[in-house]
């Protein structure tokens, strides 16, 4: 059984910045990503609802972007009229930044 002297102090204060990440999309468009816990939980709940209702994937992605970067930035992204692969890549990048997985190596599951 562990006693009080077996534990050490772990300082994570340097890892907590409380700053929102930013993503540069074009030279003219940089967005701030709302990666707050409650916002991500709301997106996850929305994903479950969309899945139950078999809603349109694009409608979900657009609503998710609005929640992550705001309606104004989402409107600017929509105005770009990106090809679908680039739109999905943009969405996946912003979502990856929001949940902290951007830049991690993606390996296919077996």
Roles of regions detected by a PLM:
Residues 1-45, 109-110:
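Short, charged/polar N-terminal "headpieces" of proteins
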Residues 2-7, 75-110:
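C-terminal charged interaction modules
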Residues 11-14, 45-48, 59, 75, ...:
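Polar/charged alpha-helical tracts
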Residues 15, 46, 64-68, 76, ...:
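Residues that form generic nucleotide/phosphate-binding pockets
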Residues 26-30, 45-51, 73-79:
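Charged, low-complexity surface segments at secondary-structure and domain boundaries
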Residues 29, 34, 66-69, 83:
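Generic detector of solvent-exposed, compositionally biased contiguous segments
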Residues 38-71:
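Acidic, aromatic-enriched beta-alpha/helix-loop junctions
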């Amino acid at each position: 059984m562990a006693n009080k002297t077996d534990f050490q102090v772990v300082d994570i204060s340097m890892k907590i910045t409380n700053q929102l990440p930013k993503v540069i999309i074009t030279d003219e468009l940089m967005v701030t990503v709302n990666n707050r816990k409650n916002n991500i939980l709301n997106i996850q709940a929305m994903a479950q609802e969309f899945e139950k209702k078999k809603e349109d994937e694009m409608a979900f992605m657009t609503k998710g972007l609005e929640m992550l970067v705001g309606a104004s930035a989402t409107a600017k992204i929509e105005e770009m009229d990106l090809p679908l692969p680039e739109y999905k890549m943009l969405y996946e990048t912003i979502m990856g930044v929001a949940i902290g997985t951007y830049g991690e190596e993606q390996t296919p599951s077996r």
